[in-house]
Amino acid sequence: MNRTDFLQTLRDALHMLPMDEREDAVNYFGELIEDKMSDNGCTEREAIDSLGRMDEIVASVMDARTEHDHAVPHTEPVEGANEQTSHGIKTVTVKAAAVRQIMIRGRNCPIEISRGGSEEIVLRYLQDEYRQIDFSLEQGELRLIQQPQTLFSLFGIRQLFSDKSFITLTVPAELAAALDAQTSNSHMQMDGVSVWGALRLSTSNSSISVTSASAKAMDITTSNGRLTAEGLQASGPITLRTSNARLEAHQIEAGEALTLRTSNGKIVFSELNGTGITMHTSNATVDGSLPHAANHYSVTSATSNGSNTLKHHAHQGPVPLDVRTSNSAIRVSFTDNA
């Protein structure tokens, strides 16, 4: 049984529930299957089999529906952190000097990262009986982990729609730490921060925007959503990736390789620098200008059913340039040739 058939069978088996609660349950198990496949590296069939028999699943849904204990789990205060809660919004303040690594894991939750004061790291997020987010600070590692939605909490999903989840992170302009932030199905944005360690930002099925930022190395990824990057600098490699969407990159400076990848989406760029530059897409145009003269680059390029301004590039310069697409044009110019 595949996922579509399984979810339809579950929908039919829960016919006694109101339509909104029935769909909440179906959506919950759809996400649970995706999580199992991602976390355990298993197939769709294996993830479905691990859920148990259909009658057991239906019974667990009905048991969760009758549960009335809505107490928010008690959490112990974290040493070195000042925590405040108001109207379900939790604010955690930490001395920046105590942090060397920041890890954030959200779910279906937008993340915004911005520049604040010079001495503190501030986290704000929504936490209630339907959303459990665990905060910890140990040996210089700050962790904020949003737990998977429980079966019990799915019947509070009406509140989830009225009170939107979010995570905001405010850090010093010069953050003496590495930063790794991930979410899913939600927008991510970062502006005006210099990260002394590596920077990794990831989401899915939504856009991601990073501006005026620097780091030791950068890996910025989404899927099925636009990626916008401007004013980025890294002493190491920079990788920008999305799929089925447009990728825009301007004023990007990598001390090592610079990679731009998407599919079924246009790549628009200007002022890119790296020891090697790769730009790959499909079914869309690659369009922009590079610094220096044409003889600064050694070019590999390919397209189909489209024009290619790099087709007759014969120079053997110090910087490898690899540009590929399909069913569309490659239009690359060089500023020193203008």
Write out the residue ranges for each language-model feature.
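Short, charged early-sequence alpha-helical segments and their helix-coil boundaries
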Residues: 37-77
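Amphipathic alpha-helical segments within well-ordered protein domains
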Residues: 11-15, 34, 44-48
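Amphipathic alpha-helical segments that form the core helices of the histone-fold
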Residues: 26-38
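Short linear S-[DN]-x-LW-Φ motif typified by the pepsin-like aspartic protease active-site region
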Residues: 74-145, 164-182, 187-200, 207, ...
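Short, surface-exposed interaction patches in beta-rich subdomains
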Residues: 147, 211-212, 218-221, 227-338
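Acidic/polar low-complexity surface segments
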Residues: 154-158, 298
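Amphipathic, heptad-repeat alpha-helical segments
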Residues: 2-21
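Residue-level detector of well-ordered alpha-helical segments, enriched
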Residues: 21-28, 57
